[in-house]
């Protein structure tokens, strides 16, 4: 086996070296300037130990259980910003508890936000009249499916929303939204 001597190895020319240096510099600057742009489009996430997203009120502040329960009574269903920024209903159960599930407020027919109508104890879609019972199960179309569910957890007085992957307790079937 023979070794190559330095005279046998072709050297890098000045032009090739400058091209390589220029390419490396431009690539480094481009990647460095791209980082804040990508970071801008990824929303900040406050998460609990269960991997959920912090529920936000209409002003974008994190929801605390004590503050929520002080302003909402038993049976109340009010909107917070949940998973992916979707409007999600928090349910107050009793005088001192937030329900273990939330209801996504997006109608399964055409995507309208469905308001809670406490007078008839239903969610009634203003767009085409779909109706859902107090748990979000569709009771009158044209909506084809029940409203999606989300897990709600309270940790250290902070309210977290996470993806519902269990069986849908309203239908006994696998959730359609997972």
UniProtKB/Swiss-Prot annotation:
GO terms for cellular component: plasma membrane-derived thylakoid membrane. Its EC number is 7.1.1.6. Residues 68-161 form the Rieske domain. Keywords: 2Fe-2S, Disulfide bond, Electron transport, Iron, Iron-sulfur, Membrane, Metal-binding, Thylakoid, Translocase, Transmembrane, Transmembrane helix, Transport. [2Fe-2S] cluster binds at residues 107, 109, 125, 128. The keyword Transmembrane helix applies. Binds 1 [2Fe-2S] cluster per subunit. The Rieske iron-sulfur protein is a high potential 2Fe-2S protein. Belongs to the Rieske iron-sulfur protein family. This is Cytochrome b6-f complex iron-sulfur subunit. It comes from Prochlorococcus marinus (strain MIT 9313).
């Amino acid at each position: 086996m023979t070794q190559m001597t330095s005279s046998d190895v072709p050297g890098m020319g000045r032009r090739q070296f400058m091209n390589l240096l220029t390419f490396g510099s431009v690539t480094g600057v481009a990647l460095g300037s791209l980082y804040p742009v990508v970071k801008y489009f990824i929303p900040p996430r406050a998460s609990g130990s269960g991997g959920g997203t912090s529920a936000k009120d209409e002003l974008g502040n994190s929801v605390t259980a004590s503050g929520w329960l002080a302003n909402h009574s038993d049976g109340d269903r009010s909107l917070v910003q949940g998973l992916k920024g979707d409007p999600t209903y928090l349910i107050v159960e009793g005088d001192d508890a937030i329900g273990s599930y939330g209801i996504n407020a997006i109608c399964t027919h055409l995507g309208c936000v469905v308001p809670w109508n406490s007078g008839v104890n239903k969610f009634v879609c203003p767009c085409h009249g779909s109706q859902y019972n107090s748990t979000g199960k569709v009771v009158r179309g044209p909506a084809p499916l029940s409203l999606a569910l989300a897990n709600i957890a309270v940790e250290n007085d902070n309210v977290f929303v996470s993806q519902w992957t269990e069986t849908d307790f309203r239908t006994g079937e696998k959730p359609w939204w997972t």
